Amino acid sequence: MNAAQTSFPLTADISIPAVGFGTYLIAEDAAPAAVSSAMSCGYRHIDTASGYRNETGVGEGIRRGLAAAGLTRDALFVTAKLWPGNPAWGDAPKTGAQTLAECDASLKRLGLDHVDLYLIHAPYGGDQRLHQWRALLQLKDAGKARSVGVSNFNIGHLEEIKSAGLPMPDANQIELHPWSQKPELVAYMAEHGIAPIAYSSLVPLSTWRSEPGQDSAKTDEMRADGKIFSDMAAKYGVSEAQLLLRWGVQNGYAVLPKSLNAHRMRQNLDLFSFAIDDADIARMATMDRGDGVAWASGDPSR
């Protein structure tokens, strides 16, 4: 079994690849080569967002990757995201009409007539949040998004949708790794048929966002504690990244590693030649620190 053949159910008739290629912090001009290289390594899910400011480059990479592999569009799963606005940053929330227009703009930049999953990137829409969600449901009905979901939503945000009598999201993309396990949210999502997609799976790595100026809430204590994962990875004969990604897929979460190195791209796909044993899974369950670590400004789901 390999990652290209493994997927998790998203809707009754749509599955999401277990391992996708994340494109956050990949520059527009680097995206074509990165995405096409990832596809040549075997990735069949590409994750991007309007907020990443690289959709044009990602779209070019998709076209190159499909052509090089002799694949058609339906062989690839593409996720895009609406930036909902954020009043705290002086960015007015998108209205329902603006949400529809934003999706059209993303599709144009990507050079696609539809995406496989379209997400509201964060719950920052305030009183426009439900209008944004209704717009996503319209996009699904129109065939511009095969499935729709949210990102960084907590139980309260999801209950808002439920209380409005609207269909629940197909997926919620959230920060998930041994230091931020969100058991109550994950259980709620399972109860309501919302697929979990994990981002920032590699937070515990010493190299994760280690460059000066890269945003995170990672402390020196956390950096010191990361050695436990290197010891555990050595036990299985895998990299720390593979161990952390395997933790995600073993829990049923689609994961989204990013690398510009072809060797590591392939390595991050190789998650099904080993399994973390029950004792280590139990040990990792004790490492939960609660809120996310990915953002210095705090967990966006709060």
Show the residue positions of the predicted features.
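Beta/alpha (TIM)-barrel catalytic core signal, keyed to glycine-rich beta->alpha loops juxtaposed to Asp/Glu
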Residues: 123-302
